[in-house]
From Swiss-Prot:
<dbReference type="InterPro" id="IPR050054">
    <property type="entry name" value="UPRTase/APRTase"/>
</dbReference>
<dbReference type="GO" id="GO:0046872">
    <property type="term" value="F:metal ion binding"/>
</dbReference>
<feature type="binding site">
    <location>
        <begin position="133"/>
        <end position="137"/>
    </location>
    <ligand>
        <name>AMP</name>
    </ligand>
</feature>
<keyword id="KW-0660">Purine salvage</keyword>
<dbReference type="InterPro" id="IPR005764">
    <property type="entry name" value="Ade_phspho_trans"/>
</dbReference>
<dbReference type="InterPro" id="IPR000836">
    <property type="entry name" value="PRibTrfase_dom"/>
</dbReference>
<keyword id="KW-0479">Metal-binding</keyword>
<dbReference type="InterPro" id="IPR029057">
    <property type="entry name" value="PRTase-like"/>
</dbReference>
<dbReference type="GO" id="GO:0005737">
    <property type="term" value="C:cytoplasm"/>
</dbReference>
<dbReference type="Pfam" id="PF00156">
    <property type="entry name" value="Pribosyltran"/>
</dbReference>
<protein>
    <recommendedName>
        <fullName>Adenine phosphoribosyltransferase</fullName>
        <ecNumber>2.4.2.7</ecNumber>
    </recommendedName>
</protein>
<keyword id="KW-0808">Transferase</keyword>
<comment type="pathway">
    <text>Purine metabolism; AMP biosynthesis via salvage pathway; AMP from adenine: step 1/1.</text>
</comment>
<comment type="subunit">
    <text>Homodimer.</text>
</comment>
<keyword id="KW-0539">Nucleus</keyword>
<dbReference type="GO" id="GO:0044209">
    <property type="term" value="P:AMP salvage"/>
</dbReference>
<dbReference type="GO" id="GO:0002055">
    <property type="term" value="F:adenine binding"/>
</dbReference>
Length: 187
């Protein structure tokens, strides 16, 4: 199957919730994909095919997953790519020496951390999360990878809120598997 065929099938599994978590957002719940092992495999295979096609001849050393939903598929994707998995967590959740990045949220700031020895310098990394909205958390993960002198090949997302233009903040190109939400819901 092609990535497009996989994406069509995966999109059919999403559940939609208008005006959640706030007015104007159509929340698309991708958790039903994980209830069906065949759909979960297709999700991983879609990202694997995309990355292998785009980065032919280049080894992806690590998949970096953002807390918490990047943890749902990041480790499986890392295994499929024969790469390591490295988590980015909220402040205070990782042991040992960490580096941190601050990012803006709707009502203040938050901090992401990564273990300082988790990625050797010049490693090729891909950063994954379920969705990109404003881009703050993804950019913070990119900042962490760059602090460790990693080479960010790409950011990969299952979904995107295009109208928030979050990908414009990122330090590398991005790929969104399922079509995004191009505009806010009308009120």
């Amino acid at each position: 199957m092609s990535i497009t065929e996989y994406a069509t099938e995966l999109k059919g599994a999403l559940r939609q919730y208008p005006n959640f978590p706030q007015e104007g957002i159509l929340f698309e719940d991708f958790l039903p994909i994980f209830r069906d092992p065949q759909l979960f495999k297709k999700l991983i295979e879609s990202f694997k095919l995309h990355l292998q096609e785009k980065f032919t001849g280049k080894k992806i050393d690590y998949v970096i997953g953002l807390e918490a939903r990047g943890f749902l598929f990041g480790p499986a994707l890392a295994l499929a790519l024969d790469a390591g998995f490295v988590p980015v967590r909220k402040q205070g959740k990782l042991a040992g020496e960490v580096v941190h990045a601050v990012y803006a949220k709707e009502y203040g700031e938050d901090v992401f951390e990564i273990q300082a020895d988790s990625i050797p310098e010049h490693s090729n990394v891909v950063i994954v999360d379920d969705i990109i909205a404003t881009g703050g958390s993804a950019k913070a993960a990119g900042d962490l990878a760059l602090q460790l002198n990693a080479n960010i090949l790409e950011f990969c997302f299952v979904m995107e809120l295009d109208f928030l233009k979050g990908t414009q903040k990122l330090q590398a190109p991005s790929f969104t598997l399922l079509s995004g939400q191009e505009e806010a819901l009308s009120k």
